């Protein structure tokens, strides 16, 4: 799970696959590598039957082995809960407005939600993905690469032929993939303008372990930028939570060993801190749930029961500890 770690006495402490965001261009390679790690973990989880995703294989290396630490059930369960939660928020939003809505994924990595939505018949106006150019250029190559005997053609989900510009941007009617630094307001504005997003219709922004790599000032500025430009924005943010204990120190140490700094960790200390950030940016309705609440109350409990049976855990303490240190923030104006 991206930047997910557990306490130092846990066997999952080494299972950290992080989509990192940093202040240096030199860290782009690390971001790309950790995105690859996360994709492999998701691919492994889907192969175990946690959820169906016929598209993830286009981005994963099926010949690459997932490390033993990343094979632990807690990691796969964590990825499932996170993936299911974000998808539910987005589907509920699209259904609320009968598909007359847009989705913007910030720090998208190799996420496949667009294809999962469209293949299931979900209606939407536009789906825009944003990440560093080093990531989007690689994603474009995966999207456009020749189709293998057992692979799906990702281009079939597009409303029009894909047009690639500057090797890092792709535009295809209902789908857009753009390379931009989320901390650079002008760059982000210019790139979003090429997607011809409507600022007047409901738009949901999603971010998974993204804001935590930005300074508090930068993430708040991004949120204010969204509120000022879109009439009906919603935001769903997944990231670290309760970050003042030993659990987080272990995570920071693991990330620090790989040259990664969590510049926005102070905003993840508590629900109050998260609410304060979003309210200061102009969001009025803000709700914070940790992943234990998401797992036990928000997600389909029939699915939760099925997930529990895939790889039976001897005890739930480790998973509960992991879930206690991640949350979902949902916000509207």
From Swiss-Prot:
InterPro entries for the chain: LCMT1 (IPR016651), Ppm1/Ppm2/Tcmp (IPR007213), SAM-dependent_MTases_sf (IPR029063)
Assigned keywords, A-Z: Methyltransferase, S-adenosyl-L-methionine, Transferase
One Pfam family in the UniProt entry: LCM
GO molecular function: protein C-terminal leucine carboxyl O-methyltransferase activity
Alphabetical GO biological process terms: methylation; regulation of mitotic cell cycle spindle assembly checkpoint
Catalytic activity: [phosphatase 2A protein]-C-terminal L-leucine + S-adenosyl-L-methionine = [phosphatase 2A protein]-C-terminal L-leucine methyl ester + S-adenosyl-L-homocysteine
Cellular compartments per GO CC: cytosol
Binding residue positions for S-adenosyl-L-methionine: 42, 82, 107, 131, 181-182, 208
Annotated function: Methylates the carboxyl group of the C-terminal leucine residue of protein phosphatase 2A catalytic subunits to form alpha-leucine ester residues.
PANTHER family, per the entry: LEUCINE CARBOXYL METHYLTRANSFERASE, LEUCINE CARBOXYL METHYLTRANSFERASE 1
UniProt record similarity statement: Belongs to the methyltransferase superfamily. LCMT family.
Full protein name: Leucine carboxyl methyltransferase 1
Name of the coding gene: lcmt-1
